[in-house]
Amino acid sequence: HTRQIEFIEGIIMRIETERLNIIALTPEQLELWTHSIGELEKELLCSYKAEPMEGLFREIVCGQAEKAKKDPDNYLWHTFWFITKKTDLCVVGSVDFKDVPNSDGEVEIGYGLGREFEHNGYMTETVQAFCNWALQQDKLKHIIAETDVDGASSQRILTRCGFKEYARNDTVWWRL
């Protein structure tokens, strides 16, 4: 599986896998996503069929958009990346890091997939490529993730990508 990384003006904008393009949204595109998916689809020439932009998810994306705007040098750690199928340019999900790496060199990953695209290996393919890219960045030593105790699908993705469980209480914590 060849993974290509495209650089535009020195900034990574896209990670390519066998079936997917993982595209970093600009701070402006993040904002557009929260209030006008149709406009964003036109700009990116894609069709959005991933998680509905509502409720807690919308609040999270709005918060990340603010961080991305305030910290442009680190926006790739704050933005969401669209997971787009190469065959039909359909956005099936998104992936992000929740902040810049902390003082221990750790960053937390988050991800979600539209229901109709589950159980096709898209998220495993995405998490693997996304983590491979991240681990090549300066100062990053580990990627961590939090799952629900009963989140078997998410836990399988992390296990397939080499994550190991390191803590369990109300949720389960994983580290790569």
Question: Which residues make up each language-model segment?
Answer:
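GNAT-family acyltransferases
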Residues: 3-108, 113-116, 129-133, 137, ...
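Glycine-rich acyl-CoA binding loop
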Residues: 119-124
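Conserved beta-strand-loop-alpha-helix junction that forms the acyl-donor binding cleft
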Residues: 145-155
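Conserved active-site tyrosine of GNAT-family acetyltransferases
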Residues: 158
